[in-house]
């Protein structure tokens, strides 16, 4: 990850990105698409890389741009702006590489800004407005709102077979 991602916002406490068990805090990687700020739990993120060449996959899900190679492994790339139906004029320049239940997948985003330490009291459940199943929470920052996304739901939409595995692991 870039140096700008290693800085965490804390209340005067700079412990880094690892938290003690039992705290009422968690950390998110904040990123943007269009004019909207989103977050993903840092525990699901393996790394953030700059956009890399992609190999198209015939008959892939419409959200999949193709495959990219990372350290010799082919990883599917989800076009997150397309998946979220967010209009943007900027060219996405970062890939958030995630690992969720041993399944690696990359998410194309416009810009990754930083890591934040968040108190659970600063997060609210997502309001029930339309189909918001991809948003699990709203985080209120001083000058903006960050939408915490449910990446498991996005993966399940793309690949129902993976959904069965995710459901099995959770039981």
Indicate where each model-derived feature is located:
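An acidic, low-aromatic, low-complexity terminal/linker signal
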Residues: 1-171
């Amino acid at each position: 990850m870039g140096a700008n991602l290693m800085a965490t916002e804390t209340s005067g406490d700079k412990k880094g990105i690892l938290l003690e068990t039992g705290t009422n805090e968690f950390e998110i990687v904040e990123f943007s698409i269009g004019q909207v700020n989103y977050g993903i739990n840092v525990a699901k993120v393996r790394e953030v890389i700059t956009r890399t060449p992609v190999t198209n996959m015939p008959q892939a899900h419409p959200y999949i741009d193709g495959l990219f190679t990372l350290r010799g492994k082919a990883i599917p790339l989800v076009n997150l702006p397309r998946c979220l139906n967010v209009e943007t004029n900027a060219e996405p320049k970062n890939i958030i590489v995630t690992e969720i239940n041993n399944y690696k997948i990359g998410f194309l985003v416009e810009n990754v800004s930083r890591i934040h330490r968040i108190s659970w009291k600063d997060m609210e459940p997502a309001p029930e407005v339309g189909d918001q199943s991809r948003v699990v929470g709203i985080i209120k920052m001083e000058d903006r709102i960050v939408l915490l996304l449910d990446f498991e739901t996005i993966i399940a939409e793309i690949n129902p077979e993976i959904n069965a595995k995710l459901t099995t692991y959770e039981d």
